[in-house]
Design a protein with these regions (language model features):
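An aromatic/glycine/proline-enriched structural segment found at the starts
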Residues: 2-53, 159-173
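Long, His/Glu/Asp-enriched segments that create or flank divalent metal/ion-associated functional microenvironments
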Residues: 77, 81, 85
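M16 family metallopeptidases and their MPP-like homologs
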Residues: 1, 51-72, 92-179
Length: 179
């Protein structure tokens, strides 16, 4: 968002932080392992100042090792996650077009399990209408189970594939333009 004089900024950073000594024995950064669970875990958090109700369901899974991110396997995993997210989010969007939708908004995504760095999760979440949490929960679980059992149609995949590839092309062009 503008031109930066790299040499000037680097000199300023060195000047500002020069007097801060490096730690002699820095603590090793450790991440707590998140355990799997056999039965669903349920948690309800309330806030009297919150104006919306949000329902989230996390389907935990192991994460891909970091050393594979920048490989063909990492690219394929990223592509598959994006296509699946696009397809299920399109289904949620269609549900919201109905006369009495089960939620105000819904979204699926795959990433870290909450703030954990050691466990991934496929997450479905919805903005819920007052008094309709059961309706929203049923819709989210039903749709994710439908995907698990039956997958997606060829036409859903074709539309999602085209959209995801367009996103990759736009990202590539943006990065190419800036470098």
């Amino acid at each position: 968002v503008g031109d930066i004089d790299v040499d000037k900024v680097e000199a300023a950073v060195k000047r500002i932080f020069a007097d801060i000594p490096a730690p002699v024995n820095p603590a090793k950064r450790e991440y707590t392992e998140v355990a799997d669970n056999d039965k669903p875990l349920v948690s309800i958090a309330t806030d009297k100042e919150a104006s919306n109700m949000v329902l989230s369901i996390f389907y935990k899974h192991d994460k891909m090792p970091k050393e594979l991110y920048a490989t063909a396997a990492g690219l394929m995993k990223d592509y598959m996650e994006n296509v699946v997210e696009t397809m299920i989010n399109e289904r949620f969007a269609e549900m919201m077009q109905k006369a009495d939708p089960p939620f105000v908004a819904a979204q699926a995504s795959d990433g870290d399990f909450m703030i954990a760095k050691t466990k991934g999760a496929f997450t479905v979440a919805a903005l819920v209408k007052e008094g309709e949490i059961d309706k929203a929960l049923d819709a989210l679980v039903t749709e994710t189970e439908r995907v698990k059992r039956y997958g997606f149609t060829a036409s859903e995949y074709d539309r999602a594939r085209i959209n995801v590839l367009k996103q990759y092309e736009s990202l590539f062009n943006a990065v190419s333009y800036t470098h």
